A protein has these predicted regions:
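Accessory/interaction modules and long regulatory regions
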Residues: 1-283
């Protein structure tokens, strides 16, 4: 199931149009992803209280939070394959040995009724289905087009509270077959892996859920993997090693992000520790 923990590097989109869901998986992180896998606790069936029970039987129980309520989904480890003998939908890892993305995708499809039912969606809503007390929010980036300073501040605050984020590029009549001149797939969901500042410039690290597949495209502007901006100091500061191979992961300035994306998808975890705050404006 998990060969080496859960990482965004394990996820590569297949023939299913669920880039939003896979982008959500990409930002969950190892701990949250592993926590989605449950074993059934039933005192009347001793074998089923064994955490390895579902591994032994080839079945898995997963916990979601649809509509604010826990929902448990049980699936087996059979996944659809295409006529080339490869997973038809999500592929896990370069060697295909990471099973967790395909199992989670299958469980999510069962949660909503079918694989077809989970085609096309929003990153923040998928995150809310997988995070305890998740509060989803969608922001239209045109709101910040004339106020980059406000966007920089908003993004910094979201990163500070460890909000989970994704992004959506503008729709296109060709769907995600269209790629703009800067290498951004159109009508496509991306994961926001990190937000950081370097020498006074705010940067975002994003991931195309196509991963290392043949359909992958990457940003080719400032801070792209082949950019001269990647000095030894920059690599160390941002903890990033540019990859000669297109793997879907890249950094870009927030100014270019505003010009190339249409929405930012946010899911914040509301906890008692964080507290509640109320603001009102008198009319």
């Amino acid at each position: 199931m998990f060969q080496d923990g859960a990482s965004h590097e394990d996820i590569a989109q297949g023939a299913l149009g669920d880039c939003y869901f896979l982008s959500a998986l990409s930002v969950l992180g190892n701990e949250r992803t592993v926590d989605l896998f449950e074993c059934q606790q039933d005192s009347n069936h001793a074998d089923e209280t064994d955490p390895n029970h579902w591994k032994k039987t080839g079945c898995f129980m997963l916990k979601f939070h649809k509509a604010g309520e826990f929902q448990y989904i049980i699936v087996d480890d059979y996944i659809p394959y295409n006529n080339m003998g490869q997973p038809a939908f999500t592929k896990g890892g370069d060697d295909g040995l990471e099973m967790w993305p395909a199992i989670l995708e299958k469980a999510y499809a069962k949660l909503y009724g079918s694989y077809t039912a989970i085609e096309a969606g929003k990153v923040h809503m998928a995150l809310a289905d997988m995070v305890d007390n998740g509060f989803p929010e969608q922001l239209a980036l045109k709101t910040f087009m004339n106020n980059q300073k406000l966007f920089t501040s908003r993004l910094r605050n979201l990163d500070k509270v460890q909000a989970l984020m994704g992004a959506g590029s503008p729709e296109h009549e060709m769907g995600d077959r269209a790629i703009n001149e800067e290498g951004i797939v159109q009508g496509h969901a991306y994961a926001i892996l990190d937000v950081d500042d370097y020498q006074g410039e705010q940067l975002l690290q994003l991931r195309n859920p196509h991963g290392k597949s043949a359909h992958t495209s990457e940003w080719n502007g400032d801070w792209a993997d082949d950019s001269e901006k990647w000095t030894a100091k920059a690599k160390a500061s941002l903890n990033y090693t540019p990859n000669d191979q297109v793997d879907g992961v890249f950094w870009m300035p927030n100014s270019d992000f505003l010009n190339n994306f249409k929405y930012i998808y946010i899911c914040r975890e509301l906890t008692v520790k964080a507290g509640w705050h109320c603001q009102s404006i008198d009319s």
